[in-house]
A protein has these predicted regions:
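The feature marks non-catalytic terminal segments
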Residues: 2-12, 185-313
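Active-site beta-strand->loop->alpha-helix modules in alpha/beta enzyme cores, enriched
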Residues: 2-195
Length: 313
């Protein structure tokens, strides 16, 4: 009897939970704020980061109706195993599967200052300098000029890892610190001006949430709405807006949302988890060792992303 009850419960969960996820993903796609008509750069450390960690974001932001132009800047060739030339090509193929307009929109840096290493932390100033050269080459002239000259950049939005790096990889974490340094440099000596680039970072979650697949959507939505509620309560009691970065109603100085949540579909189609997996299995074939099969099946980052606007950079 007990075994029958358990079996019935499992069967019901196998139907109800995916259905709830599909509904929740559709709500996220239609009701949560997103970015439109922006020049966006995804900053990653290694070829395959875009597929393993940011696929839901790329699939959402490259939808034709958003009007965004998304590019990828990868700071290493991933040459730790001597496959840098292969992985460079794999990244471009993955980028096209994930919706980028052209292979040339995925650029790979090959520089000894940014070696693929699980033990190496990249220099913050060197990361920031590279970003300045790529997106704000006039930065040194701006700093030398009168403060009345507004800061400028060739991108509107920069996406990268947060301080936890998702997997605590030092190369990932280095991007976070370098990106923040770059954002700060844009407005250094320019009081009163809004930063021309909004920085969003991918939220790192704990082990249990990381490997619960699409089920983490419920914790993610709860976290986002709880943050919004806390912010509204703070506003009501103090008369001022709160500082909770998870507040979905919080906006940047340019009016961009304070939180970006994206989710892939479970069924087929362009914005599905199957497409995210294909970016690994069809593009990054050199990286498909045994444990990555577990990642692309169980990781919540294949199904959903939560990126927060960085304040006070």
């Amino acid at each position: 009897m007990a075994a029958t009850t358990w079996a019935a419960g499992i069967a019901a969960a196998a139907v109800v939970l995916p259905s709830l996820y599909v509904y929740t993903a559709s709500v996220i796609a239609t009701r949560f704020p997103t970015l439109r008509n922006k020049r966006i750069c995804l900053l990653i450390a290694h070829p395959d980061d875009e597929a393993m960690f940011f696929a839901p974001t790329l699939l959402a932001l490259t939808r034709p109706d958003t009007g965004n132009h998304v590019k990828i800047l990868c700071l290493s060739t991933g040459d730790q195993d001597g496959l840098g030339h292969v992985r460079r090509t794999e990244l471009k193929k993955s980028a096209m599967l994930l919706g980028l307009r052209d292979e040339d929109d995925a650029f790979v840096v090959d520089d000894p200052d940014f070696r693929d290493s699980i033990t190496e932390t990249w220099d913050t100033d060197k990361v920031a300098t590279l970003l300045s050269a790529a997106f704000a080459p006039q930065l040194s002239r701006q700093q030398a000029a009168a403060s009345a000259q507004p800061p400028m950049a060739s991108i509107d939005v920069l996406l990268t890892f947060d301080a936890g790096g998702v997997s605590a990889h030092p190369n990932h974490i280095s991007l976070y610190h370098g990106a923040r340094r770059f954002i700060s440099a844009l407005t250094a000596g320019k009081p009163g001006y809004a930063c021309p680039v909004d920085l969003y970072t991918l939220t790192t979650v704990g082990f249990a949430r990381k490997y619960c697949g699409f089920l983490d959507v419920f914790a993610t939505i709860f976290s986002a709405t709880l943050g919004a509620g806390a912010n509204m309560a703070a506003s009501a009691t103090s008369g001022f807006g709160g500082n909770n970065k998870r507040d979905i109603k919080n906006k940047s100085d340019k009016g961009n949302p304070g939180l970006l949540v994206t989710a892939t579909g479970l069924l087929g189609g362009r914005e599905s988890a199957a497409t995210a997996r294909q970016a690994m299995t069809q593009a990054h074939k050199s990286q498909m060792v045994w444990f990555r099969w577990g990642w692309i099946t169980m990781s919540r980052y294949m199904y959903l992303n939560e990126l927060r606007l960085e304040k006070g950079s």
